[in-house]
């Protein structure tokens, strides 16, 4: 049988004797009828010093929990950054660093912030960022993409030229084929393609681009595009060169732009080159 000594503990602060009976949710303090709160099976004295110590302990536990969560969040963010294919030198960017010196730059900022909020709300919009060379299209897209990564979203970044080169590389690869590369880009949670139209595609390349955009359109996946060209000019730019008879088939180019613009909001950047 358990002795009384084994069922008592002494408050280290005030010296009161506390009776501990396993299984009780609360226990009277020995010597009076004051109730004591239990943490598990451990009685906590209600003296001022004990309450202060308990609160301090709980604060330390909470601080440790928050520190662990912050560390784990930073590690997850770092992994998403690495998987995004974005240059490490960009990783400090964010929309807060986007300069808003002109009404156009402010409008671009507001539109990018609104797009990010739609993504966070669970929507699946796309974004079309156009403007002359040097007006900040890549900067704006990268700032937005990095903010999305920090918020917990997975992003895949690629220059369109690099995408096409990765597709061409499958010609001599035994490990990857076109379908593997297309699916890699088509399945990305959020895809950012930089400089669409800079490289005029062949008929084959245009078909591969359409396959990616069409699947993303069908899957409802957000896509962010930067380009120097407006809709009509982009169609011309994505149309393969004319054949021997002088005929240029723009069917695929029109289909690409249709898929891009179907669910996309538009940001038009203006002004002189910042480079």
Regions found by a protein language model. Give the residues of each.
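Loop/turn-to-beta-strand initiation segments
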Residues: 125, 153-154, 187-190, 219-225
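N-terminal pre-Walker A segment at the start of P-loop NTPase domains
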Residues: 95-122
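Conserved catalytic network of the ASCE P-loop NTPase/AAA+ motor domain
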Residues: 119-122, 148, 183-186, 214-219, ...
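A short, basic N-terminal segment
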Residues: 1-101
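Short glycine-rich substrate-engagement loop in P-loop NTPases that contacts/grips substrate
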Residues: 106-112, 146-187, 200, 207
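Walker A/P-loop nucleotide-binding motif
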Residues: 121-141
